[in-house]
Amino acid sequence: MDKQNTDSEKRATAEAPPQSLCTLVSSSEQGGMDITNHNAKAGAADEYPHGVRLAAVVFSLMLGMFLVALDNTILGTAIPKITDEFHDLNKVSWYGSAYLMTFGCGFQSTWGKFYKYFPIKVWFLVAVFIFEVGSLICAVAQNPTTLIVGRAIAGFGGSGVGVGIFTIIGFAAPPENRPQLLGFTGATYGIAAVLGPLIGGAFTDKCFYINLPIGGVAAGTIFLLFKPPTSASPAKATPKEKFLQMDLVGATLMMGLIVSYILALQYGGQTHSWKSSEVIGLLVGFFLFVLAFVTWEIYQKERAMIVPRLFMRRYISVGSIYMFFFSGAYFIILYYLPIYFQSVYNSSPIGSGVKMLALIIPLTLAAIVQGWALSKIRIVPLFWIIGGALGTVGCGLFYTFDTETSVGKWVGYQIIVGFSTGWTFQIAMSNAQVHAPPEDMSQATAIVNFFMTVGGAFFISAAQCAFSNQLIKTITKNLPELDPTVAISTGATQIREAFTASQVPIVVDAYMVGLKAVFAITIAAFGVATVIGFFGSWKKLLADELEKATGGVA
């Protein structure tokens, strides 16, 4: 079996529950693993690390997953403070979109090809190094542009780290133990999701320094203790074929269309009129990039980052489109709830992180329950519809937020949205793993993940556009003597210091109007996702199909 198929197998076990690390080490030390013919080429048992070496490798992979997960959640509560330092609220969408754009928009497929055709260990260390460089740039950034560039570099490196973790797992333990390793990484992701808002709130603009020692330990451990088995040797191909497999043209076109889209929404109604040549030109460029990207991917066929043959299959297309809208709504909430708490409630960054635990803890618990529930219910659209409907209701309740919303309400509403997100987020990936044949599994899961991250980048930008336009419109109407750009350039946590006592309530109300526009977008996104969920296959999954997606532990 080539490396791509091995990668497919280890991805297919992602829903397995975590088990004790001691149990894993012990079972690995016993040797004599029963490896099936299907997985025989994943490496002989004596090539796998054992004992302390295995524990160290697993620990380093958990650190790597912690890094990737933390960077998805740490920034939300830090953003309002960062806007204070840079005096620019208008760049908020870029702080999130820049990372998501390079983290998932085609580059996961590219990194997968790197791990297939080049030494795994070397390129994993390269990915960690790139991520660390991006984090360092973010940490020392003195202006928004530098921070955005750092976020983009970190996203590209983080994409390689994420793909590399799952690839190394495929060669760090025999097939029957891989679900346990994936369970550890899954648990680590949940821990990072909980700690991210707290760390971001506590360290605010210095939060990026945290990545440096963690990444250093992870890279050092892999460098010293992980020895790739002979089965992990790079796949044979000509230099030309290796280059073509990267689909760098597709990745470039995708970057072009996302940048055009983000800039159009950033300029429109804020620094330029919607009818200006700049905005119209960017929107036209966006649609031309979309057309070019689709045409190129069809032409590339099996070399494409989005293989047309796979995307036309219902279990991938419906799940991918569903997650485009669903994850878009989730990322908006992750980035704009802290702004609500810090601007309207005057919470500190760490205070807003504590308040968001009402969202993150139910999300994590629901994600754990979801794996068990899927093995019992086995009807995928039910999860999509329930999750989307709860998200729609929860965000509808978010829309009722005002400057005097009680604690009970904002806690309860977050619990609803958190549960809906955790209940649903992994279903599309599991469904792809269930139905895709082994040779297509890595590509199938990559397509679903691609749409998840692109959805985040698109909807964060749309939310920022709506927020800024409504903020400007409201201040212009209710406080005409104040230049709206002053409110935009004032950080969310500096409202009460930057404006007079008579102006503060009006500016806070303007923030609330902008946030209501943001929440309206999440209502629409969750609602569209709910409708799309009805188009999934209602055929009940078979037990052996679920075993395929959970490594035989469903």
UniProtKB/Swiss-Prot annotation:
Query: What keywords sit in the KW lines?
Result: Membrane, Transmembrane, Transmembrane helix, Transport
Biotechnology comment: Griseofulvin is a spirocyclic fungal natural product used in treatment of fungal dermatophytes.
Q: Does the keyword Magnesium apply?
A: no
Please give an example of a GO cellular component term from this record.
plasma membrane
UniProt cross-references to PROSITE patterns, sorted A to Z: MFS
User: Where would you find the membrane-spanning parts of this chain?
Assistant: 54-74, 93-115, 120-140, 152-172, 181-201, 206-226, 248-268, 279-299, 321-341, 349-369, 379-399, 410-430, 447-467, 518-538
Gene Ontology molecular function terms on file: transmembrane transporter activity
Family annotation (InterPro entries): MFS, MFS_dom, MFS_trans_sf
UniProt-annotated location(s): Membrane
Kindly give the membrane topology term recorded for this protein: Multi-pass membrane protein
Q: Which Pfam families match?
A: MFS_1
User: Where is it chiefly localized?
Assistant: membrane
Task: Kindly give the CDD domains that the UniProt entry links to this protein.
Answer: MFS_Azr1_MDR_like
Per the record, the domain of life is Eukaryota
| Record's function text | Probable efflux pump; part of the gene cluster that mediates the biosynthesis of griseofulvin.
Q: Which family does it belong to?
A: Belongs to the major facilitator superfamily.
Q: What is this protein called?
A: Probable efflux pump gsfJ
Name the gene for this chain. Answer: gsfJ
